[in-house]
A protein has these predicted regions:
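Non-catalytic, usually N-terminal nucleic-acid engagement modules in DNA/RNA processing proteins
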Residues: 1-43
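Glycine-rich phosphate/ribose-binding loops and adjacent secondary-structure elements
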Residues: 33, 37-41, 45-104
Length: 104
């Protein structure tokens, strides 16, 4: 998995948005570095996979935008981050359903 910023919950909208932007930049850097390392002859395991981590707190619009951005990187897998960190069960299940519906 790529680096991501684990923010507190709840967090202000702007901070969550900025954090997602930062996490996306880290993911792009991780992908480039992994591609560089896998191009080397002496790389031991070229089959490692890089997963992107979807963040966005409990803000639907940020989560959707962040997932769309990281999906464009065409990674082998994705994870849902920033859940079960203090939000209500209702909020957690809402985010899981949002994620699930985006991928039907």
């Amino acid at each position: 998995m790529a680096f991501d910023e684990c923010i507190e919950n709840p967090a202000p909208y702007k901070y969550v948005k900025d954090s997602c932007d930062r996490t996306y930049r880290w993911l792009v850097r991780c992908k480039k570095e992994m591609e560089r390392l896998n191009s080397l002859d002496d790389t031991i395991n070229k089959n490692q996979m890089l997963f992107g981590i979807n963040q966005g707190g409990t803000f639907d619009d940020i989560r959707i935008e962040h997932m769309q951005r990281i999906a464009e990187l065409d990674l082998p897998g994705y994870a849902i981050g920033g859940l079960a960190v203090g939000e209500s069960h209702e909020e957690m299940y809402h985010i899981l359903m949002l994620y699930f519906l985006m991928h039907l």
